[in-house]
């Protein structure tokens, strides 16, 4: 990843517009900024959220609050809690996430 054409700045995430995204169950609320072609998001999943698709996009995800369960297409499963992160490349390992208790995430892709 090459970070270029990004001036120094501070983001107050509480002031970034929140958009709703329905899961198979539950909701995801995104606050999204783009910096030089890099998408950066603060995402909140409601309790009971299950993604409505298998994702093949690459991400770096840091769990800030709650608990995120991620399953890979090959059957492996991982749990993130506050302070844990995962990273995956584009088109590398399809994955799908869920949460029983809700989760707040910081995502770079």
Question: Where is each model-derived feature located?
Answer:
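A short, N-terminal "cap"/entry segment at the start of jelly-roll beta-barrel domains
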Residues: 1-41
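Conserved short histidine dyad/triad with adjacent acidic residue
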Residues: 36-55, 89-92
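Short, conserved beta-strand element in jelly-roll/cupin
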Residues: 45, 54-70
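Short beta-strand His + acidic residue motifs that chelate non-heme Fe in jelly-roll/DSBH
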Residues: 52-53, 70-71, 88-89, 93-100
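Short acidic-glycine-tyrosine-enriched beta hairpin
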Residues: 74-91
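A short hydrophobic beta-strand segment most commonly corresponding to one strand
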Residues: 85-88, 101-109
